[in-house]
Amino acid sequence: MAGAERARRDRRNRAARGWALGLLVALLVQFGLGMYVNLFAHIPLNHPGHRAKNFFAGSYHNVTWAETSPHAPLILAFHAGLGLLLVLGSLWLAVLAIRGRRAGFVWAAVLGALFILGAGFNGASFLNYNEDANSFVMALLFAAAVLCYIIILALPRSAIRE
């Protein structure tokens, strides 16, 4: 591998490590917001999208309601908004990892993005159907995403052994 190509990949992998750390911190904040919503926020059952027959249409209405309605708890808006940012950030980290071409980074980043996406779908499903199982799965997927980003931070800085 040429020196310039190796330097480019190392830069991308350093950026991926930075993004992994940022996402890890954001996930911990998200967990705290989610626990507050779960324990203390009152989410009315008559909001737009609740019990929708079409999951995706209902989810769209739920998230729109959570982000824009004066009747939605403000903490829910923060939780949903940070969740959307986590999805975008995790997808960007996956792109950086793929471009950096380190197998461990790629696997952990792609799995982390899938776990965050799955947690988001379960959050939308919780607003749709108000089932505790969705909240439980969201917590499990959070833990799995945290593990993925810890793995990225734990991997050696360079794939090339000196």
Can you describe what each PLM-predicted range is?
Residues 2-162:
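Polytopic transmembrane helical bundles with strong interfacial aromatic enrichment
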